[in-house]
Regions:
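Vicinal oxygen chelate
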Residues: 1-11, 15-24, 52-53, 68-92, 94-148, 170-190, 196-201, ...
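Core segments of cupin and vicinal oxygen chelate
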Residues: 6, 11-59, 95, 103-111, ...
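A generic structural micro-environment signature
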Residues: 28-29, 43, 70, 89, ...
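Generic N-terminal helix/loop capping motif
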Residues: 36-43, 67, 83-86
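Extracellular/lumenal glycan-associated surfaces
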Residues: 38, 210, 256
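Short, flexible domain-boundary/linker segments around small modular repeats
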Residues: 58-65, 193-194
Length: 263
């Protein structure tokens, strides 16, 4: 069994702190992401409801769960935002036009989680930390480096994020193109990107969060991902948050690889 290192970065309120993957074929997904990012897997037990975590150099960096058989749920990566008391976040989400899906769920002593939809329909989670405040690594190859929220309801979602999580936004829109902004947590640090899905996008693309995992060089990382069976959606591109590419994994789950711009 891999050793577990629970030393993690300090995540302020409202910051993306964890991601997990919901898929039908867990074993296939584990093989894909192990080969791509070098992850090892720590199997869950009864106390965590079978929740399995990906480890990188002993640090927890992501989770994985199996979809219920026949459930009408897309395979997807979920971004979790850090909160204090999850019941307070639950009330705020519903009060500001979002919708919580079910009740808070404990993952043993690690954390309590809650899944919700924002007013634009994007699926996300909130994370009340216990023994696990979040991902043990950031910006290292194979670990989470950035998150982006894409929405068709830009103004309402921006107001929702401000009301629930206190996020302030710096507008980054250029030359009359689709609106986008950088969200900041209360400490002033950048937390994630917010981008508008405008009429140029295909209508079938839903609002969603995209988790980006760090790499040192996007070209060989992309080639490796494609060789493992990923599908290229967009890129490579030189974007506002680094050089990256958007991909879909074995079950169509969307994620990004990114050489982060840490300047």
């Amino acid at each position: 069994m891999p050793d577990l290192n629970l030393t993690v970065p300090d995540y302020p309120y409202g910051a993306p702190c964890w991601v997990d993957l919901l898929v039908g074929d867990v074993e296939r997904a584990q093989s894909f992401y192990s080969d791509l990012f070098g992850w090892r897997w720590l199997a869950g037990d009864a106390a965590t409801g079978g929740y399995t975590m990906a480890l990188l150099d002993g640090h927890p960096v992501a989770g994985i769960s199996r979809k219920p058989v026949g459930a009408p749920i897309a395979s997807q990566w979920t971004t979790y935002l850090r909160v204090g008391q999850i019941e307070v976040a639950e009330a705020a989400i519903n009060a500001h036009g979002g919708r919580t899906l079910g009740r808070p769920v404990p993952i043993g002593a690690l954390a309590r989680t809650l899944i919700a939809l924002d007013p634009g329909g994007a699926y996300f989670g909130v994370w009340e930390p216990g023994d696990l405040p979040g991902s043990g690594l950031l910006d290292e190859p194979g670990s989470l480096t950035w998150n982006e929220l894409l929405t068709r309801d830009y103004d309402r979602v921006q107001s929702f994020q401000l009301g629930v999580f206190g996020h302030e936004f710096t507008d980054e829109t250029e030359n009359g193109g689709p609106r986008w902004a950088t969200a900041h947590t209360g400490d002033g640090n950048p937390a994630y990107g917010l981008a508008e899905i405008d009429d140029e996008w295909p209508r079938e693309i839903p609002p969603h969060w995209v988790a980006s995992f760090a790499t040192n060089n996007v070209v060989p990382a992309l080639a490796k991902a494609l060789d493992l069976g990923a599908t290229l959606i967009q890129g490579p591109f030189d974007g506002p948050y680094g050089v990256g590419a958007v991909l879909s994994g074995p079950e169509g789950e969307v994620f990004s690889i990114l050489v982060p711009d840490l300047d």
